Amino acid sequence: MAPKVFRQYWDIPDGTDCHRKAYSTTSIASVAGLTAAAYRVTLNPPGTFLEGVAKVGQYTFTAAAVGAVFGLTTCISAHVREKPDDPLNYFLGGCAGGLTLGARTHNYGIGAAACVYFGIAASLVKMGQLEGWEVFAKPKV
């Protein structure tokens, strides 16, 4: 399932079909947020059922918002700058996603740090994709 979703994202050329890219990044981030929420609710049980539902929604929708902002920013940046395969587009998208997280938490420090870290991580992922880096190499038998 996961490789299919990631392939769906990478198969769309940067700077085109921004709505499909945003949908893909939103769905990936939503699953990540739902997973984090499941761990949070399991390891730190809420007092009531409604508190648990609220925490799951908070984690899931925050992650979905970060993913949507990332997808839209990278795509629009690639389209406006007319440089589709530039890691700077991904830095801008990661930074915008980090700023969204900071706005959600009402904390400038978290927003600034997340901007830098998400931007660097997204740029490295794009550089690795362009240069063919293998994160998990297949074993040679």
Curated annotation (Swiss-Prot):
Designated gene of the protein: NDUFA11
Stated role: Accessory subunit of the mitochondrial membrane respiratory chain NADH dehydrogenase (Complex I), that is believed not to be involved in catalysis. Complex I functions in the transfer of electrons from NADH to the respiratory chain. The immediate electron acceptor for the enzyme is believed to be ubiquinone.
Annotated keywords: Acetylation, Electron transport, Membrane, Mitochondrion, Mitochondrion inner membrane, Respiratory chain, Transmembrane, Transmembrane helix, Transport
Keyword Acyltransferase recorded: no
One CC-aspect GO term: respiratory chain complex I
Top-level taxonomic group: Eukaryota
Residue ranges crossing the lipid bilayer per the database entry: 21-43, 58-80
Protein's name in the database: NADH dehydrogenase [ubiquinone] 1 alpha subcomplex subunit 11
Cross-referenced InterPro entries: NDUFA11
Recorded family membership: Belongs to the complex I NDUFA11 subunit family.
Post-translational modification N-acetylalanine, affected residues: A2
Localization annotation: Mitochondrion inner membrane
Quaternary state and interactors: Complex I is composed of 45 different subunits.
Membrane topology qualifier: Multi-pass membrane protein
Protein's GO biological process: mitochondrial electron transport, NADH to ubiquinone
